[in-house]
Each structure stands twice: as C-alpha cells, then as structure tokens.
A protein has these predicted regions:
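Flexible, active-site-adjacent loop/turn segments at secondary-structure boundaries
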Residues: 11, 15, 24, 34, ...
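Residues in well-ordered beta-strands of folded domains
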Residues: 25-27, 42-44, 75, 216, ...
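Generic, ordered loop/turn and secondary-structure boundary motif
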Residues: 14, 18, 25, 55, ...
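Secondary-structure boundary elements
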Residues: 93-171, 179-181, 247, 258-275
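Short capping/connector residues at structural and topological boundaries
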Residues: 18, 22, 31, 68, ...
Length: 275
C-alpha cells in the first residue's frame, strides 16, 4: 500500500519570539515494513538533518530572529507492507529483524519520569508477572490496560506520567502506551514508545487524521507491537515516525524558545492511499 501523507504544524504567538529551536521528528522510519518513496520537510529556513540516539531522522530548526509564527510542513509518499497471518501483531518498525546492534534493547528497560510506576501501578503490573515474558502474556497485559483505560476522544493534552494516567483511567493513546511501557519495564521487559499515523477504514472522508501512538516490547529477539487503542484491527496501516523511551523522545515536534508570550498550535494531518 502506498500512503500519501501531509502534515502541517503552525505555531502563532501573541508576542515576538526572539529565538527558538524546534526538534522535528516527522520523517518515517525505513525498515522491512515501510519504505520512503518521496519525502520533504519544509521549514522557514533550512533545518539541519541528523539522527538522534534512537536512530530517528531528526531535523533541527533554529531561528535567531524575531518571528510571530512558525510553519513546519512534512509531506510525501511511503510504501507500506502489512503483516501476514500469525504475524499480525508484529511491528512496522523492525518486526522480524534483530535489533540494531548499536542500541541494545536493554536500554529500554530503564524507567523515565513519564514511565515510572507508583504503588497502584506496580501492584497492577505484578498481577501479570507470571507470563509477562511471553507474547501471549503481554497481549493479556495490553488487553487489561485497554479495558481499564478506554480512550477519551479528543484528549491530547499535556503529557502526564503513567502513574497519573493509570489513576485517571480514561485518557489518550499516548497514556495507554506509557502505562503499558511502565508495566513492562517494571517487570523487566524492554519496551519503547512509537509515534506515527494510522490509516483505517474509519478514517474521515476528507482524509484528516490525528497522530497515533503505540508501544513495542522486546520478546523472542524481536520487537512486537501493542496498539492498545485498536488491537491492530483489520483494514488499517500503521506508519511509524519515531521511537523513544517515551513520548518526549519520539514526539513529532518539540521545541524551546525565548519570548513569544502565549503560544497557539494548530496541527493538521491528512493521509490517503496513493495510486
């Protein structure tokens, strides 16, 4: 399947931004499940391209003159290949392939402030410890989290910790992924966060979509995906942008600035099947 993606982000400010740096992770990862045919990042001035510590393509945009708005646009076409049969739950990122030898999966056993557990979440995780080292056990864990934490439509607010999200009980796909990752790491299983998009039969008629997120866990010498929001439903295609220890490592755009006053952000993403 060929997916055409257009992603536009507009930041506006009620006072001039004196200087800013934006860290942009809007270039899809290339692997056995997805291959870039065309891709472009448009920024007010040329951004520096590099790779971060997780292997994501990273564009760094630095503006050192006053501005009242910042526009960032990513667009292109990606060829995707869907999983087959019993491999349905395997990830678009690295599924069926050994881990990148330069980055051990053990890196993803370390808890972050966003993926730390409290007593309540630790108790919940321990209830699934018996079979957590198996794919079936992790699927049971993912299902239990999804049942306890149904998605609240439209909830894409500030990033909160896994423990806070678990206590709230009904939040975003980001929070579901963080809780799953926190449980995995607490039980000794490497797990990581994935940001990206999802195309499905229920996508809006105008092609507008929201960003998507899921988790991956390391079992049997490969990464397996766990999309708690959709359970990898049929008629879908997942497109991975970036991976990281949590959302803060893998979010599409993250920045710092001096000045600017109140910031307003408008994001619009459109995805369609290309011929």
């Amino acid at each position: 399947m060929k997916l055409a993606i257009q992603h536009a982000t507009l930041y506006t400010y009620d006072a001039p931004v004196r200087s800013s740096t934006q860290y942009i992770r809007l270039t899809p990862r290339e692997n056995s499940r997805q291959r870039i045919l065309e891709w472009r990042i448009d920024t007010p001035i040329p951004a520096t391209q590099t790779r971060d510590g997780y292997g994501n393509v990273l564009h760094v945009l630095t503006l050192d003159k006053p501005v009242s708005e910042i526009r960032i646009r990513a667009h292109g076409i990606v060829q995707t290949r869907a999983p087959d049969g019993e491999n349905e739950s395997l990830s678009p990122s690295d599924a069926g392939f050994p881990a990148n030898s330069s980055l051990s999966p053990l890196v993803f056993r370390r808890a972050t402030p966003v993926t730390s557990v409290d007593k309540a979440l630790a108790k919940f995780a321990h209830g699934h410890r018996k079979h957590v080292g198996t794919l079936a056990g992790l699927r049971d864990l993912a299902s239990a989290i999804a049942d306890r934490m149904p998605i609240k439509p439209g909830d894409t607010g500030a990033t909160i910790s896994a423990a806070e999200a678990f206590a709230e009980g009904a939040l975003s796909v980001r929070d579901q992924a963080h809780v799953f990752i926190a449980c995995c790491r607490h039980l000794g299983v490497p797990a990581r966060f994935v940001s990206g998009y999802m195309h499905s039969a229920i996508v809006s008629t105008d092609g507008l979509i929201a960003g998507h997120a899921w988790a991956e866990a390391w079992v049997g010498d490969q990464w397996h995906s766990f999309d708690l929001a959709t359970n990898w439903a049929k008629n879908r295609a997942h497109l991975a942008l970036a991976v990281g220890a949590d959302y803060l490592d893998a979010c599409p755009i993250r920045g710092v600035r001096i000045g600017g006053g109140i910031e307003t952000m408008l994001v619009q993403a459109r995805l369609s099947v290309s011929q």
